[in-house]
């Protein structure tokens, strides 16, 4: 089997008082499944011995700018010993290529955490929806930050450590800004409100986006558009299954939205043709300009490739989701004032 060596911060009683307990090398040996543990300050001195007589050195290429320099110094120290029989690694590989793909597949423990995070986030959205309607019924002023506060309260009340990302609460026309951040605008009766928010729980993210009537009641036009987007989401969920291509949920979404845009008159069939033409020419793009899903896990846009090599020099989007991989499906539609 392999041998694990950990380099970590040394034990420091004074820093423990300020920052919390750190294990240090000695405690790490007894509490973690490693065979050796050293202070991080001796990494450069220990590195040549760890690299010697290994065929490949794996490390993250792009995450720490100084690490490649330190690795190269260690390799040079080994190369200087080649005349004495030492073997220097002949390959350098990016460990993120392995770790990113490993992170895509969650075990049952991870899935349970993510299910709980999603439950907390769903409760937070419902809380904000109810609060918006209640405040408007009472004749109170409603601002976007009022609903943001309701989200954070629900997250923390149920054990979430943080929001998984900066929450978006956008009322009325503000919802047409995809990455809206002001979080201060008024919310009026008759407005639609978009909330894009999810909590982080035990290191795992959730991500939910919903649009709802601020006063609790859709107008006929709002309901028509909402039902169309909901139908596209249902199509995406139905297409998200083990063995499907990653792009399948997006294609299912686009098909429903494109037909719906023709049906409700957002697109004129006399000008753009049938649904196949709308999709081929991307006429839908003025209302739906982004992809439907993304990986979800320890980060809200989790690592892992969306393409895979199919042959030398070419790539394919035919990424087959496996059991335990998490995809966030999020159809939506942007209708700006005046459209």
Label the model's feature ranges.
Residues 1-339:
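Active-site neighborhoods and metal-handling regions in enzymes and metal-associated proteins
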